[in-house]
Amino acid sequence: MPVQWTVSHPTRLVIAVARGNLRLLDIEHYLDGVVTANALAYRKIFDMTQATPSLSDDDLMALGARIRAYIVLGRIGPLAIVATAGKSHEQARMFAALAEADRPIKIFRELHLARQWLDSQPDVTG
């Protein structure tokens, strides 16, 4: 499975790691899992340092629209994306611009910096 994730309800944190060929369907499956776990408001880290994105501009626009549609479900927690490769980093930046949802979102090249930033974000779960 290209995206594996863990939801920690006690710490209100979702950690996702993408590996291999990353497609739209993989990310949609992850998002479905987050919604099903009632974890939209949790802090999230999405590590795509081991993934090769196979996402078109249309795919990124569809993901952005999906994230914006989640706003009606309640608060959306902060997101740290870790992407080191040029294409991954570029697509992460495009996703961040398209998925504006009144929440902090930041892109990092190093996992420990992403985690440090995410840990400094306030809990928005109420």
Positions of the model-derived regions?
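Amphipathic, Lys/Arg-enriched alpha-helical "gate/interface" segment within cytosolic domains
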Residues: 1-126
